[in-house]
Amino acid sequence: YAWNKVYRRELFRGLTYPVGKKFEDVYILPQLLSRCKLVATTSVGLYHYYLNPRGITQTAAGKAMTDLLEAHLHVLPEVHDAIYHSHVLNIALDVYERTGIVHELPRFDYSLTLKQKVLNLIGLKKLCQLNKFLHRFYRRSR
């Protein structure tokens, strides 16, 4: 996501955010990273984050979550990483809960998380249904 990063202006030259998409920064972040010669990170918090209960991440409905998933699905086939895959899987499960639509994910035999193990056993559609059923009884607060 774009909000917690510092960029050189020239990285954005020729790039545009997609019109009409929520989470639009997720669509161009891979392109920005591909233009970088160096990426530096720090574990030190350098700003104060404000959790906006009315912000897009807290109020995202089906269309917004679908936009987020589609942005990640463009990148997922190129990024062979179990942790990233588990995050995208969680987004796909959220999209199903909000829309009832199953969006196919590329097949990887990851088994880092319980959800990934269950995905490999029963498939995405049944995992979506199971996840939604379980959330009727148990849901972590966001």
Residue ranges and their predicted role:
Residues 31, 70-74, 91:
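Alpha-helical elements of Rossmann-like donor-binding domains used by nucleotide-donor carbohydrate transfer enzymes
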Residues 100-142:
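Membrane-interface aromatic/basic loop that binds lipid-linked glycans or pyrophosphate carriers
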Residues 1-60:
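Conserved nucleotide-sugar donor-binding catalytic segment
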Residues 61-62, 83, 118, 137:
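Extended hydrophobic/Leu-rich segments
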Residues 78-86, 122, 142:
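Structural motif
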Residues 86-95:
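Amphipathic alpha-helical repeat scaffolds of TPR domains
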Residues 46-52, 58-82, 101-109:
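Catalytic core of nucleotide-sugar-dependent glycosyltransferases
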Residues 35, 78, 98:
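Active-site catalytic microenvironments for nucleophilic, acid-base chemistry
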